[in-house]
């Protein structure tokens, strides 16, 4: 058994020429590329979706040694978007029509042993293909290229094609295998290795699954995602005194866990899980789908650790690296077959069924996956087609329930779970529809597969009221899905902004529907999710204050509502170092069902009137309440407040003077506000809001240690303009000039504008090791630089 990574040495042409498949093609101009690769890097916005829709070609030359005689040579592509035809030495050897799943090509019969060989790929990324997800309008781009890793394996004529293990939380298991070639007389050996390194061995025949039970297992769960490793060996018994021979072995990680999806929700190992998730688009600025494993894994880390999600919905099968990270982190995954709204003809449907097979067979050993999506998202009912998708998936994996995302009520329910796209909330009233009014069968599971972002997009550079409105809408729907009995949970749309077609988005080819921008910089609405995390240490405390306290950002200079998104026990407010008030979450208010309701900061005066104006202790709170009402309601007073004003013998002019002294700051220096998040009786996080005095460019590298191999590696970089207190400056739109030093190259432009005070870039390795730096320069701020270390993997 030999394994080779095949991600270097490729040549690319953006225009496919049949000559590329020949042994020699000197007439072609080919570009050296490393995988993963996109057929066309796009600008951040105002891109043209026609640019990546093309028939392109890839080529790789290699030497096939004579020692491969009698062996099987397999070439595996992680994904090629979207229709791939593979040639070996001019001969067509394989065709694959899904840009989101892997495929393996048997090169054996086409090889010239002891000679140079050529593999070529005809890559069709045009959107008129009669395969999913194409055929209708799409609110996302589909890109093109060999967008995941490629490897070559040299095996015996008989080998393991697939392994799959079914488990229960108690330790019971059943192992299934699939083989290729002549295996008469062969046996199987299965080895299960625990995280501590202990091993258990089992033997079996090829015709039957291997069954058994492991004692004292640690179940896989969200809080404790314990992973075991299964290794299956295909063994040919020795004859004539010769030892047994291992023909092939295949490994996968798995977890012991039990899933149940019923009318009451999802139960993992017997415990109900309230799903709190986001939808993830697997695309990135400039590169589309073509990003290495470390960047894929980073998305899972952001979802679980930064955003506090326990689940994610994927509308297409993702990179295996993303699923690996979900397994390790305890992030539940709802993965769906490719497609959006459109269902095509019989040829299209046949490919969709094949996509379902590949999705399940390639992903089913991942314990993080809890639900298969077997309907084209948002499509109309199609009984015969969706009966087949359900049957196909249940046959290949009877351990998980099926679901289908739809946007209509009372749709035909052939699946185990009714997944509903609920965009019913418009800022008032109940945040989601009643489950009983939507699903045709209340005995089955129910979840909300999408909400909010498409209904109320928000750019990071929108004004403060708009950004706050989006955040409160997310909070309202999250709250009401929790409050409604029988709703298993919800998935907000969506994690990040993304490039889209001209028919969608804001006219610049971007859908600003994410709680993060395309570079994974958080918007205010991200704090709604992040603040729902259960804190276990002071570093887990989140505090995001919705207002910059700049009254000029609001119509008429009236600031309106101010909210704090926090998982602290309480919030203290100080004005110019004077204590104003302490606030706690309202457990009976609009967001009472949330684990950590956002806190409305409704008092900006407190006892300051008593301290500085000499107003007595009884009257001061009443006057403060009137002033806070004026702040909230643009100087309008309710009849009750007017009556109070007269009873306190205050004139309107006196009230206005107090308002501008303590709230409106007209004619006096702007106040300094300090917000303290209190946890276990002490302040553990502080936010200070005051006029900007200095600007700093903050540069954060999410993965500063890179390893080149088996593909190029990549560092994600976040850029933020912040003030002297670390607050984001959302209206800073300066350009940042980037330059790389060392074995790195910048993906995308070297000059990037800040949008909403934020930007980003990606740094790719070049195949060499060594120290590296990124230099960032912005007018009005000190230059900044960050250091990275690049290593090369030893072969």
Question: Could you describe each region identified by the protein language model?
Answer:
Residues 174-176, 301-305, 310-527, 532, ...:
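Substrate-binding/catalytic cleft of secreted carbohydrate-active enzymes
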Residues 268, 489, 500-501, 506-511, ...:
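The feature marks long extracellular or luminal low-complexity segments
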Residues 1-43, 122, 471, 475-478, ...:
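Accessory carbohydrate-binding/adhesion or oligomerization-edge regions at the termini
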Residues 58-60, 101-105, 206-212, 759-761:
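Short strand-edge motifs at loop-to-beta-strand transitions and within beta-strands
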Residues 3-16, 38, 49, 53-160, ...:
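Accessory beta-strand-rich segments of carbohydrate-active enzymes
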Residues 39-64, 68-76, 81-88, 94-95, ...:
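Active-site-adjacent substrate/metal-binding segments within catalytic domains
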Residues 112-116, 181-260:
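Extended acidic/polar, glycine-enriched regions
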Residues 124-131, 237-242, 679-684, 779-784:
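Short acidic/polar inter-strand loop motif in beta-rich domains
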């Amino acid at each position: 058994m030999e394994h080779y990574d095949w991600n270097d040495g490729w040549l690319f042409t953006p225009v496919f020429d049949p000559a590329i498949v020949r042994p020699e093609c000197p007439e072609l101009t080919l570009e050296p590329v490393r995988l993963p690769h996109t057929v066309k890097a796009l600008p951040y916005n105002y891109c043209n979706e026609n640019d990546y829709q093309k028939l392109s070609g890839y080529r790789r030359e290699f030497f096939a040694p004579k020692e491969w005689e009698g062996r099987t040579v397999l070439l595996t592509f992680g994904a090629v978007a979207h229709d791939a035809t593979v040639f070996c030495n001019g001969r067509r050897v394989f065709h694959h029509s899904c840009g989101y799943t892997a495929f393996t090509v048997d090169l054996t019969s086409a090889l010239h042993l002891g000679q140079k060989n050529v593999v070529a790929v005809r890559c069709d990324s045009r959107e008129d293909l009669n395969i999913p997800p194409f055929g209708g309008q799409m609110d996302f781009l589909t890109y093109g290229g060999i967008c995941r890793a490629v490897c070559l394996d040299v095996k015996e004529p008989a080998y393991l094609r697939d392994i799959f293990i079914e488990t229960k939380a108690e330790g019971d298991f059943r192992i299934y295998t699939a083989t290729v070639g002549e295996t008469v007389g062969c046996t199987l050996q299965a080895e299960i290795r625990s995280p501590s390194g202990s091993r258990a061995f089992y033997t079996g025949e090829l015709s039957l699954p291997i069954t058994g039970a492991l004692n004292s297992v640690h179940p896989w769960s969200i809080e404790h995602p314990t992973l075991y490793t299964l290794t299956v060996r295909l063994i040919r018994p020795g004859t004539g005194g010769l030892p047994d021979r291992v023909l092939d072995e295949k490994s996968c990680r798995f977890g012991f866990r039990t899933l149940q999806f019923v009318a009451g929700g999802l139960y993992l190992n017997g415990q109900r899980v309230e799903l709190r998730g986001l939808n993830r688009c697997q695309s990135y600025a400039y590169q589309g789908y073509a990003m290495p494993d470390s960047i894929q894994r980073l998305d899972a880390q952001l979802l679980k650790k930064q955003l506090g999600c326990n689940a994610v919905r994927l509308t297409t099968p993702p990179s295996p690296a993303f699923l690996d990270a979900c397994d390790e982190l305890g992030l539940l995954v709802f993965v769906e077959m490719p497609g959006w709204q459109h269902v095509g003809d019989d040829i299209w449907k046949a490919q969709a069924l094949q996509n379902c097979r590949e999705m399940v067979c390639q992903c089913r050993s991942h314990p993080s996956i809890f639900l298969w999506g077997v309907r084209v998202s948002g499509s109309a009912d199609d009984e015969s087609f969706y009966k087949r998708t359900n049957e196909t998936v249940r046959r290949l994996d009877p351990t998980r329930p099926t679901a289908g995302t739809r946007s209509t009520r009372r749709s035909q329910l052939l699946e185990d779970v009714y997944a509903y796209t609920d965009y019913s909330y418009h800022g008032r009233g109940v945040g989601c529809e009643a489950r009983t009014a939507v699903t045709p069968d209340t005995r089955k599971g129910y979840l909300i597969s999408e909400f909010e972002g498409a209904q109320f997009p928000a750019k990071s550079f929108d004004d403060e009221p708009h950004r706050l409105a989006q955040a409160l809408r997310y909070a309202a729907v999250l709250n009401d899905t929790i409050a409604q009995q029988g709703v298993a949970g919800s998935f907000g749309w969506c994690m990040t902004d993304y490039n889209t077609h001209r028919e969608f988005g804001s006219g610049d080819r971007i859908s600003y529907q994410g709680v993060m921008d395309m570079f994974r910089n958080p918007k205010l609405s991200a704090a709604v999710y992040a603040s729902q995390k259960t804190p276990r240490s002071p570093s887990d405390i989140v505090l995001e204050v919705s207002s910059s306290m700049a009254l000029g950002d609001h119509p008429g200079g009236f600031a309106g509502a101010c909210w704090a998104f926090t998982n602290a026990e309480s919030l203290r407010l100080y004005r110019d170092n004077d204590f104003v008030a302490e606030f706690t979450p309202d457990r009976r208010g609009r967001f009472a069902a949330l684990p950590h309701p956002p806190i409305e900061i409704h008092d900006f005066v407190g006892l300051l009137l008593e301290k500085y104006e000499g107003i007595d202790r009884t009257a001061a709170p009443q006057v403060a309440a009137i002033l806070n009402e004026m702040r909230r309601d643009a100087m309008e007073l309710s009849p009750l407040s007017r009556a109070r004003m007269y009873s306190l013998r205050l004139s309107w002019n006196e009230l206005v003077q107090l308002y501008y002294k303590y709230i409106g700051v007209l004619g006096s220096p702007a106040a300094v506000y300090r917000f303290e998040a209190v946890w276990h009786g002490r302040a553990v996080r502080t936010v200070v809001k005051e006029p900007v005095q200095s600007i700093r460019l903050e540069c954060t590298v999410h993965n500063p240690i890179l390893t080149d191999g088996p593909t190029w590696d990549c560092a994600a970089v976040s850029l933020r303009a912040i003030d002297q207190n670390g607050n984001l400056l959302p209206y800073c739109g300066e350009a940042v000039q980037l330059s790389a030093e060392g074995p790195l190259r910048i993906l995308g432009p070297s000059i990037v504008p800040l949008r909403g005070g934020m930007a980003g870039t990606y740094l790719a390795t070049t195949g060499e090791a060594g120290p590296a730096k990124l230099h960032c320069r912005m007018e009005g701020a000190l230059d900044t630089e960050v250091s990275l270390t690049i290593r090369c993997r030893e072969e």
